[in-house]
Amino acid sequence: DCQPCGHNVCC
């Protein structure tokens, strides 16, 4: 899983 960090970006 990845955390949302930005407009439509995953971190």
Swiss-Prot record:
Changing residue 7 to A: Has an abolished activity. Has an abolished activity. Expressed by the venom duct. Changing residue 8 to A: Has an excitatory activity before killing the mice. Has an abolished activity. It is found in: Secreted. The keyword Repeat does not apply. The cysteine framework is XVI (C-C-CC). Found in the dissected venom (DV). Negative results: has no strong effect on the whole-cell currents of neurons and the currents of Drosophila Shaker channels, human BK channels (KCNM) and Nav1.7/SCN9A channels. This is Conotoxin qc16a. It comes from Conus quercinus (Oak cone).
